[in-house]
């Protein structure tokens, strides 16, 4: 029985834990954060071979010299196997609130019930102790109300605001035992803050990214649509093709999600800070909501933070972690991410291997027929975009014809993205002359980029046929196609950039 003929619950009830996973390529992309332990060509090649698609640089740490070495090593690793181009992502530090320095670098123990002062007075920036703690957000006394909670050090310390003493000082009560230390992060849940989208450091980091031709920006602590517009302005003309992926990690970002989604290229569900800003028990609800809205909009969405965290030190993940990865894929995530597992972990390659295999199992458990019908039913008609109309029709034809792949000839990557939106059960092979667009296509589930380097032929149709043939040749090497398989080809009607308006059924030769 086809998946479109049964309800979602019936489909799940029919799954088998001894599922025979077909020998298909994984469709969900994997982001790996690179740290000193993994920043070498040999390890990067191993990570790629295990399943890494995107190299992430965390600009909360490291010098420009270090990040330059990551870029250089990633490109060297990518060049060893052009069949699998690696994308490079720059993750901004973003606007943060931090405590000051303690006197002499000493840690000061504090107990539940203890009362102290939080101050924005610069005189205490390097004189924090168990009586006064400096906060570097000048407007904290203006935005926070008595009774609100302030978290410090990733939520390890919790304080309740008792009263506003004056324009620079808050009186707070300690909610749990702990210690006051230097330069710890501060979170203000349920409080709207007016921090700028980009610090001066972030702006310099973005310029570094533009100079080095990074493929995408993971923009931290995005709170409103205007933040995205500001980032685009800083990237400027030279960086206009860099994709912006907004990290949602606070209540403001969740509240303004729809307007952010309208202007961004994609979303990352950043569950670390989000789980401090909103109750941890509500994070999975926010995750499902954001993934669903991204799927409906046809924009890529990544799920991140603590996915296989135990593998930082252990050779095998916990069962809960594996379920977390699998369920993120079932929710509809286009990408899943590793952080400490690959920056400092003892088992980085094993972590990627587990993540890749779990994603493949989850993908094999999806009722593609009913999913396509559901996505098609959610589209507002008539479709305003000719390319999307063609993509929808092509996927429908692929189902009826039992085609084995969709070959997309693309300049911008937009057609492949729109095909991915409808979650076809077969791979999308994107053939493009633009290496950056090829690398960026890793943002979309089920898209396999092929870089075609030959110059255009004067005869448009001959050039089309040459690109299709090359795409099929590369698909053979990726074990996506066999000669004689039916394929759907999507192309434009004329040369150059424009709408994709033609699809045809043919045979891979």
Curated annotation (Swiss-Prot):
One of its GO terms (cellular component) is cytosol. It comes from Schizosaccharomyces pombe (strain 972 / ATCC 24843). The gene is pyk1. Substrate binds at residues 56, 272-273, 305. The keyword Magnesium applies. It catalyses: pyruvate + ATP = phosphoenolpyruvate + ADP + H(+). This is Pyruvate kinase. Pathway: Carbohydrate degradation; glycolysis; pyruvate from D-glyceraldehyde 3-phosphate: step 5/5. The modification Phosphoserine is found at residues 29, 63, 281, 412. Keywords: ATP-binding, Glycolysis, Kinase, Magnesium, Metal-binding, Nucleotide-binding, Phosphoprotein, Potassium, Pyruvate, Transferase. ATP binds at residues 58-61, 98, 184. Disulfide bonds: none annotated.
């Amino acid at each position: 029985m086809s998946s479109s003929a049964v309800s979602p619950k019936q489909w799940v009830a029919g799954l088998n834990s001894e599922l025979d996973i077909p020998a298909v390529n994984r469709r969900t992309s994997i982001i790996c954060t690179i740290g000193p332990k993994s920043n070498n060509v040999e390890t990067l090649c191993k990570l790629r071979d295990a399943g890494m698609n995107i190299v992430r640089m965390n600009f909360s740490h490291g010098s420009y010299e270090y990040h330059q070495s990551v870029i250089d090593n990633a490109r060297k690793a990518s060049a060893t196997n052009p069949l699998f181009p690696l994308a490079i992502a720059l993750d901004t530090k973003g606007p943060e609130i931090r405590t000051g320095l303690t006197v002499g670098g000493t840690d000061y123990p504090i107990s539940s019930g203890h009362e102290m002062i939080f101050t924005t007075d610069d005189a205490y920036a390097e004189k924090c102790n168990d009586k006064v703690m400096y906060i570097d957000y000048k407007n904290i006394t203006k935005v926070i109300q008595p009774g609100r909670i302030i978290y410090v050090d990733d939520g390890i310390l919790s304080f309740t605001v008792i009263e506003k003493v004056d324009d620079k000082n808050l009186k707070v009560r300690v909610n749990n035992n702990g210690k006051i230390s230097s330069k710890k992060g501060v979170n203000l849940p349920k409080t709207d803050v007016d921090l700028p989208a980009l610090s001066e450091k972030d702006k310099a980091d973005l310029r570094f990214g533009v100079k080095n031709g990074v493929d995408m920006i993971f923009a931290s602590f995005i709170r409103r649509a205007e933040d995205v517009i500001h980032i685009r302005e800083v990237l400027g003309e030279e960086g206009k093709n860099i994709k912006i992926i907004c990290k949602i990690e606070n209540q403001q970002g969740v509240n303004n999600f729809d307007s952010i989604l309208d202007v961004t290229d994609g979303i990352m569900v950043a569950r670390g800070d989000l789980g401090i800003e909103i109750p941890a028990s509500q994070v999975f609800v926010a995750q499902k909501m954001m993934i669903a809205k991204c799927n409906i909009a046809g924009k890529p969405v990544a799920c991140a933070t603590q996915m296989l965290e135990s593998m930082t030190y252990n050779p095998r993940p916990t069962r809960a972690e594996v379920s977390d990865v699998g369920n993120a894929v079932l929710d509809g995530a286009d990408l899943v991410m590793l952080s400490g597992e690959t920056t400092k972990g003892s088992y980085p390659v094993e972590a990627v291997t587990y993540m890749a295999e779990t994603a493949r199992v989850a993908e094999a458990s999806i009722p593609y027929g009913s999913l396509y019908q559901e996505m098609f039913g959610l589209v507002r008609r008539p479709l305003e975009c000719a390319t999307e109309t063609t993509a929808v029709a092509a996927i429908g034809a692929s189902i009826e014809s039992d085609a084995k792949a969709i070959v997309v000839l693309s300049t911008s990557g937009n057609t492949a993205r729109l095909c991915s939106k409808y979650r076809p059960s077969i791979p999308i092979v994107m053939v493009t002359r633009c290496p950056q667009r090829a690398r960026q296509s890793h943002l979309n589930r089920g898209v396999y980029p092929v870089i075609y380097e030959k110059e255009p032929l004067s005869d448009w149709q001959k050039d089309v046929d040459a690109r299709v043939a090359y795409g099929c040749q590369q698909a053979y090497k990726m074990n996506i196609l066999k000669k004689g398989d039916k394929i759907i080809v999507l192309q434009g009607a004329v040369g150059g950039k424009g709408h994709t308006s033609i699809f045809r059924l043919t045979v891979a030769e």
